Amino acid sequence: MADERFLAQLWSTIQARRDDPSAERSYTRQLLAAPAKARRKVVEEAYEVAEAQQGLLAGQDTREHLALEAADLVYHLFVVLASAGVAPGEVYEVLERRHGAPPRAGTP
């Protein structure tokens, strides 16, 4: 499933890890227990996205590497949102308001 529906699945997985005490060894759960570490990972991954994009535009990197770094950023951003109790749907609503799109029903 290589489309936006996977984001809902990713969000569900992050919530499941948060709510499952037996998942204590899960990387996601470790990040949720250490919000400062999760925030640092967002900053780190954002920098890596910028570096990969710069390298790609200079012909020194690949689209695949940029996509990999972007995926890491999205994952870590979702973890930060989950730790703060902010659902992706709240972010989607802000984006839709900014771009004048009608709200979609049933977004996570």
Cite the ranges covered by each PLM segment.
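Flexible "arm" and connector segments at domain edges
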Residues: 1-70, 74-108
